[in-house]
Amino acid sequence: MRFKKHLLGWLAATLLFSSQTQAAPLVLATKSFTEQHILSAMTVQYLQKKGFQVQPQTNIAAVISRNAMVNKQIDITWEYTGTSLIIFNRIDKRMSPQETYDTVKRLDAKLGLVWLKPADMNNTYAFAMQRKRAESENITTISQMVAKIEQVRQNDPDHNWMLGLDLEFAGRSDGMKPLQQAYQMQLDRPQIRQMDPGLVYNAVRDGLVDAGLVYTTDGRVKGFDLKVLEDDKGFFPSYAVTPVVRKEVLEANPGLDDALNTLSGLLNNDVISTLNAQVDIEHRTPQQVAHQFLQDKGLL
């Protein structure tokens, strides 16, 4: 009888272990730019260290990722608060960073999506200039840039300012038209040069445009010594990156929330800008950058 009890106990433990090891991996979806590639590598390496199985899916567009998450095909993503507010929930009201987070957390909870701890960073849009030029012309805000554009328009129309923009920004609800309205910015069509987002940084650095639309945490801002202009009218929403997980996945994986919150707690604008630069300028891989960062933090 005692042998039979031991045998049953061993079989139960074996089945439990087998079910754990054969559990479906957590599906992690990230977008198609450097910052998201780094977040993907960081998440995979750290969660695997903590005993979770992870299946990364990269280069997934925001809307596709969102729909897949709602349909339970994706378990985890790193999303930006402003994207959920404006694109997914279609709210254009200007809010503080905390209001933005609280709003998307509340609304997305109705879909079974849990917003965890937001990183202390804001990868929002901004205009940037060559630092030396911005300092020499005493331009630190978008309003001052607009005033300079108008001054040149009035006094030297043959040398009107050129702005570099990515192709998507012109059509966004937080894009060029409402920006021009908010700042009373007058631009003729030839003054706007649309290009691939990555080319904007080079165009500003090389003087091909006078100012360009950038992402504030892009490593090339620091690497190319660009000056980010203050959004003094508070036009651009907050884009704090945050781990978002399906509620049932969190409930089925104890400790997952703590692990992801640990990662988000390490990130701020300076940190992520430095990591982005290591990939975009130093040409290291996202996996190498993530591994070194986690090692330096004592997490691997």
UniProtKB/Swiss-Prot annotation:
Keywords: Periplasm, Signal, Transport
Keyword Signal: yes
Signal peptide (UniProt feature, chain positions): 1-23
Subcellular locations according to the entry: Periplasm
Effect of inactivating the gene: Deletion of the osmU operon eliminates the residual osmoprotection by glycine betaine in a mutant that is lacking the ProP and the ProU systems. OsmU deletion has no effect on the utilization of glycine betaine as an osmoprotectant when ProP or ProU are functional.
CC per GO annotation: ATP-binding cassette (ABC) transporter complex; periplasmic space
Induction statement: Induced by osmotic stress. Part of the osmU operon, which consists of four genes (osmV, osmW, osmX and osmY).
Major place of residence: periplasm
Alphabetized GO MF terms: transmembrane transporter activity
InterPro entries documented for this protein: ABC_Gly_betaine_transp_sub-bd
Function comment: Part of the OsmU ABC transporter complex, which is involved in the uptake of osmoprotectants such as choline-O-sulfate and glycine betaine.
Subunit structure: The complex is composed of two ATP-binding proteins (OsmV), two transmembrane proteins (OsmW and OsmY) and a solute-binding protein (OsmX).
Family, as annotated: Belongs to the OsmX family.
Record's protein name: Osmoprotectant-binding protein OsmX
Organism, scientific name: Salmonella typhimurium (strain LT2 / SGSC1412 / ATCC 700720)
Highest classification ranks of the organism: Bacteria, Pseudomonadati, Pseudomonadota, Gammaproteobacteria, Enterobacterales
